[in-house]
Structure formats: structure tokens, C-alpha cells
Amino acid sequence: MALQVMFGLEFFLVLEALLFLFTCYQVVKAGRILDEIQDKLSEVKRGERVGTKRKYGTQNKYTGLSKGLEPEEKLRLGRNTWREIRRKRGKREKKKDQLAEVSRKRSLCSSLDGLGKPALSSSEAGEESSSEETDWEEEAAHYQPANWSRKKPKAAGEGQFADWPQGSRLQGPPYAESPPCVVRQQCAERCAERQCAERQCADSFIPREEQRKIQQAFPVFEGAEGGRVHAPVEYLQIKEIAESVRKYGTNANFTLVQLDRLAGMALTPADWQTVVKAALPSMGKYMEWRALWHEAAQAQARANAAALTPEQRDWTFDLLTGQGAYSADQTNYHWGAYAQISSTAIRPGRRSRAGETTGQLTKIIQGPQESFSDFVARMTEAAERIFGESEQAAPLIEQLIYEQATKECRAVHSPKKEQRLTRLAQGLSRAWGKPRLLKTDNGPAYTSQKFQQFCRQMDVTHLTGLPYNPQGQGIVERAHRTLKAYLIKQKRGTFEETVPRAPRVSVSLALFTLNFLNIDAHGHTAAERHVQSQIGPMRWLNGKMSLIINGMARILS
């Protein structure tokens, strides 16, 4: 068994050796055939192949010896020296740099206007000296056939159909080069203008339609000679407003400050509509702003109608909104009218947010994870939308903040509760005036020592109703109900909307209406019935004319 294994190994080794020898024989044979073919080739054809390889293939590094001619002739011409090699290499690099610069300028010009191929300037063309051209032609002559010559462009009438008679349909055109296409050149100019416009708008997030609207906004300025001129709104300012609206919302402080800055400029009603339409994210928001703007303009127009100056009486609703006769010319307004237009335009931005319950302050409660400062800011903002920026409502806001805060915040501020109640009472006194008399029920809130001390300090008489007698309290409640009803009626009128009044003035006007303008069936007002005595009919008593006054007879003399 061992002998068989050894015999098999020897057989495989001998077989591999034979295969190796056969492969070597084939390689040597192929090399001999290649040498024979190369020997048969002539020296001229070999030079042509080398020239073609150098012309169309990759250029190899120069070895220092020239092929095709004898070394003695090359040395005589000075083409094998290292100085000549470095000079030629520098020329090639310079030529490459020139071609790269020309191609770069050509691509730049074609991308901007596309009006044709640019021609090289005289300075660029002069860089090619006559000696360099001669060297290139001599170098190329070694690799080109003897019968080769440069083809010259044919002049007019020297084409392949030049021998045909004039008028023949095979006769060539009477010019050597094609004429320029005027239509194609005009199309290229329009394309170049469109590309420039697209490049100018490429770095903006605002669509092109909105940019056209922005370009129509022009505030009014007065020139040096007194004439009215328009100046465009800065693009960066409108862009900042649009970004602030998209990122933070229309009620953010940053957005409101930017609107206040824009309101300092004299913008026409059309300008405000254009700017707001470009800044708001949707047409629904714009329509909501436009409705609120018209509402504010109507209130301002009613206030202008009751103004003292005749100029302000002419500032109507159409003037403030740019409608009717003022739709065409909006640059010759009075400067005060532009201030009212700006104030009415930015007023809708300070209104309550959609879906937020700002009408009821009692529903604004501090959240469990909300900071106390954020809660105070929300309450203050909602109160300002209802009461305005008034110091009279500050005690009420403080009391609501204390009652609707979390337990932890109330525990911190609890020692100051008595001071807040005192400030609340003082605030009510400033708002409504110091009362002379207070009539309340017998509740513990009104019978406490703190309340009695407050009444003594304010010099107010405090009366309580009879215990277990709801009729006396009902009279007071009915009087309050009647007074409240008249206050609501006056608020619905036009005078209350246009001229905002203090609470004291509103109550005084309601009391004046109740006491002096309501007449009973006998033609007497409530004030007359209160101050006058009850006068009865006249009668004859003891032969004399007497008048019954308060149940007693008085003789008329």
C-alpha cells in the first residue's frame, strides 16, 4: 500500500514538470515571433506608431534621447540637452494653463448670457510667440507623413458644387460661415435674464408670488422740496417679520416689537395689506386680520367724527382703510392719519389667540409644572386685553393671582394677604371714588374687625340690614340690578365704543340717566320726586284757598 502511494506522488510530480516545460516553450516561441514581426516593420512605420501613441495616448516621461534621428544630428540641433528639455516642459505647462484659463472664461460667459463664443483678447493671443509656434511645428513634423499639409478653409464659391451653374439647387450658399441666428440670440438673452432672476431669489424662503407682493409695499416720505415720495420697505425687515410669525406666532413679543418698529413708518392702507399678506402663513389668517382691522378702523372713525379738530373729522372709515375715493391716491393723507392707520393695523396682533379663554380670568389657573412667573405673565396679558393698561385693575389681578396659584405659591405669599386686601380696597376706592355710606348684610366678612377698621380709616359709614329680613336686602339688590342694566345699555352704544371712559364716569352717566332722564306719568323725574314734597290738590278751608302739602293744609295768601 505504501509503495502505491509513493508511485502516485512521483507520477504527479513528473506530470507537473512536463506542463511547466511546455508552458515555457510556448512563451519563448511567442517572443521569437514578436521579434520577427518587429524586425520586418520599417523604421518609418515604427515612427508613425510612436507618433500616434504620443498624440492620442498618455505621454510618457521624456528619457533624454530622441527617436527617429541619429544622436549626432540631435546634439547638433540642441534637442538632447537638459536645458532644452526643461524649456519644452515649461512651455507645455504654460500652454496647459492658458487653455484652462480660456475654457474657464468660456464656460463662465456661456452660463451668464449664452450669446456666443468669446474671442481671445489681443494680450492673450500675443503670448504665443513665433518661436514657440515654430518649435511646435518642427516637433510635429517628425511624426507626420511627408505629403501631409494643413487644410485651409474654403472661400466662398470653392465648395464641391462650385462648378455647377448659378441657380442650381445643388449650388452651395454664397458664404463660407453660417450667419448668426437673431431669434436664437434673443431667446438666449431672455433665458439669461430668467437665470439671473432665479439666482437672486434662490437664497430666500419666500415664494416668488409673495416677493412680488413685498415689492409693492412703499412707505410714504416727504422730499426736500415738500413733495410726497415712496421708498420701499427693507427686505430684511419683512423677512424678519415673516420668520418671527412662522417660528414664534403673531402674539409673540418679538413679533409685536417688530410691528411697532414698522408702525413708526408712514405706510398706506394698501402697504399694510401687502406686508401682512406676505408675512402671515395662510390666507385664512389674513382674512381674520383684515376683519379685525376693519373693526378697529370703524371704531377709530367714530372717534374721529366726535373730534374737536375739523381735520380729524375728515378721517373716515374709507380713508383709514383705503377704499372708495381713497383707493387710488393714498400718499397725500395728513401725517396724523398715517399714525391712526398704523395703530389700527397692528391692533389685531394684540388680540386674544384663537381658542384661548381670555374672556374669563377665573379660568386661568397655574399648572402643576408651570413656573409662577409664566403664570403671572399669562394672567397679566389676559387682564390687559380686558381692562387695558390700567393701574386700577392691578389689585384685582393680584388677588386673582393669589387665589388661582398653586398651594406652594400661596403658602409663600400668604403673609402678605392682608396687605393685598387693603390695596384691593384702596384700588376700588380710586376706581369708583370713596363712598359715603356702605350698606351690607350681616355676613362675617362685613362684621370683622379688619373691615370695621378699614371703614373708620376711610371715613365711611357702614350700615347693616335687619337680620332675617331679606326684603331690605332685596331693595338694594334690585337697585344694583337696575344700575347694571343701564350700564350694559350704555356700553352697546356708539359713544362708549369710541370714547373709553373710567368706571366712575360710566356710573355717573348711568345715575344721571336714571335720576334726570326717566319721566313718570305725571311728568316728574326721580330727582324731582325725591327733593320735592308731595303736593296735593287745592281746597277751600274756612273760606280760604288752601293747599294740601304732606297731609297738612297751608293757606295761600
From Swiss-Prot:
The name on file for this protein is IgE-binding protein
**Region Disordered, annotated ranges:** 113-172
Q: Name one Pfam family in it.
A: Gag_p24
Mark out the compositionally biased spans (Acidic residues): 125-138
Q: Which residues form the signal peptide?
A: none
Q: Which domain of life is it from?
A: Eukaryota
The UniProt keyword set, sorted, is: Hybridoma, IgE-binding protein
What organism does the record attribute this protein to? Mus musculus
Q: Name one GO molecular function term.
A: IgE binding
